[in-house]
């Protein structure tokens, strides 16, 4: 009788079910298409006024995750797409919660937007730093995620205006890496000096660890330049020699905002 009593109590507890796997990122895709332009700039003012769809998607992230409902994420690609989209959606949510701000660092000044402010994924509170450095990087060991997750800053690889999905995840990651490598905001050769995004310095070990073992020239060293080389514009790749000096750009934490003024994105990070 006692076991039946506990069973009936358990049945009364609302349980989040994945009725139609896999997890649907369509609502987030619609948000991105509506509020993010082709340069990765976000219409935060408009999004803050019309946030219902983003909030609904963030609520669904709070119910489901690869950790809480693995059946909703049948492959590694489904899992990784979830975590990339979750990171980007949580970042947007955090910014509009604090909007208007000039920098993402203004959103949680006292203790840190990335390592103290928490969001809920699959019923578990976690920070953006935890998602990136405790889940994505060690679990999936995929360096291209650094060009997919967005920190809401001008110097960050731009926020893509399409959500990541399992079926085309690899192709999507290739696209964002290629876009990054061919963007003078992040990779620029000036005289005999190569100016690179600070992200390539902060996460250098991720790229060198994944330098392809089947590379055409086995003597190529696992350097940042050689990792980027296949994705660079041919003219730039041909000009990179061994005596090129590398310098990392200062990071611009200004908000990646489209203020609807018609102003273009800055030409490049300041070296």
Regions found by a protein language model. Name each.
Residues 1-2:
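N-terminal secretory signal peptides that target proteins for export/translocation
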Residues 5-16:
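Bacterial N-terminal signal peptides
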Residues 21-271:
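Interaction/scaffold regions that mediate signaling and macromolecular assembly across diverse proteins
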